[in-house]
């Protein structure tokens, strides 16, 4: 995804540079919001804001429907650390729909919050990457009242072909999860996406993408187009 990058040097008076901070600002417009093989709504705008330094990254991400305003709104905060291909992090997902009927953000009561907290770990081998994600708190309970610890494992491989950057992805849910709608181990995400820059003028191009996603568990298929800014 192409981002607008602003680089700032953090300095003390009369001292040399002590850290380099990079800020990224961007937005995507997608024809449908598909996440890990799950359908989360129709066309949406998805802004992002991130700050990174010394391997640490703090990012904000959101999604708001632009066709059906009633679609669930989302606001995520992720803190992660990366070193030599390995990464660890925590994400706070917030949804406008959930156990908290008024959708209030600052409600963290057990079994009455619209937040979901997830920890993740991954490794990028260069030719492929793998990530494991597990919920550890928030709105993720089974029908019997037990916390589900919903988990998702994803393997992705980037490659170039035909003048485009492609990504092939395989995602699985290892055990029962109310969040992903599975009763046990299930393949929920088989996707292939191509991205390239569409040249508008000699000095301006627009990053676009298109991809197909199959969810064998729900027996659904999706084709999504996106524009990045």
Can you describe what each PLM-predicted range is?
Residues 1-22:
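Cleavable N-terminal export/targeting peptides
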Residues 18-229:
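Outer-membrane beta-barrel proteins
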